[in-house]
């Protein structure tokens, strides 16, 4: 399979809040690993966004084209530079619902437009559809580096230091995602209380949802 260059990995999976000059676009990349539960060799690959076709859609089309045995279960792990947009979320949810022999897990280096309500609702939709979404940490960055990057060419940086920095930066992003998930839980509780006609939600509960 084609591998990412070390430079591409270091630039595109960079999870700093702000990047230093020279500025560059942080593009969407999706690395996937499909592992059959019968112990067969995993299948790996990666996709970039193309014009009018996001990496997530290219990934879905690739899995569909494999003609997988629907009597066998598969674990699919995706490492993304950006969390999916709302449109891709809907496609991923529909895909997984139609292929219940696939168990999909998503790990993102960064949260795309996390302050926008539509983006937050997309993340909630994935979690509510039994598609775990988490922020990449030390284990995921190391696995992605090990399995999707070409290590044969000389490096201009220290990989260990890079991975440590990625893990350090990921902590704030993990807290941000956790707040989004918690706000979803509170919204569900509020709706449940209203449907039971138990009156308005207490102000203390509402305050606990402020960010």
Curated annotation (Swiss-Prot):
This is DNA dC->dU-editing enzyme APOBEC-3H. Keywords: Antiviral defense, Cytoplasm, Hydrolase, Immunity, Innate immunity, Metal-binding, Zinc. The gene is APOBEC3H. The active site is at residue 56. It catalyses: a 2'-deoxycytidine in single-stranded DNA + H2O + H(+) = a 2'-deoxyuridine in single-stranded DNA + NH4(+). The keyword Transmembrane helix does not apply. GO terms for cellular component: cytoplasm; nucleus; P-body. Its cofactor is Zn(2+). Pfam families: APOBEC3.
């Amino acid at each position: 399979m084609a591998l990412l260059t070390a430079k591409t990995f270091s630039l595109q999976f960079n999870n700093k809040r702000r990047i230093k000059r020279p500025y560059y676009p942080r593009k969407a990349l999706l690395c996937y690993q499909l592992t059959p539960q019968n112990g067969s060799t995993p299948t790996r690959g990666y996709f970039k966004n193309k014009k009018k076709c996001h990496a997530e859609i290219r990934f879905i089309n690739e899995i569909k084209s494999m003609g997988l045995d629907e009597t066998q279960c598969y674990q699919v792990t995706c490492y993304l530079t950006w969390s999916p947009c709302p449109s891709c979320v809907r496609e991923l949810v529909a895909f997984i619902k139609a292929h219940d022999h696939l168990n999909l897990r998503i790990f993102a280096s960064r949260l795309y437009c996390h302050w926008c309500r539509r983006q937050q609702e997309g993340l909630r939709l994935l979690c509510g559809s039994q598609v775990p979404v988490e922020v990449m940490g030390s284990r995921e960055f190391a696995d992605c580096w090990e399995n999707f990057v070409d290590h044969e060419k000389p490096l201009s940086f220290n990989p260990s230091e890079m991975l440590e920095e990625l893990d350090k930066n990921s902590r704030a992003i993990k807290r941000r995602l956790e707040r989004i998930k918690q706000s979803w839980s509170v919204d569900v509780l509020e709706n449940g209380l209203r449907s039971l006609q138990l009156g308005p939600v207490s102000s203390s509960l509402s305050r606990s949802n402020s960010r």
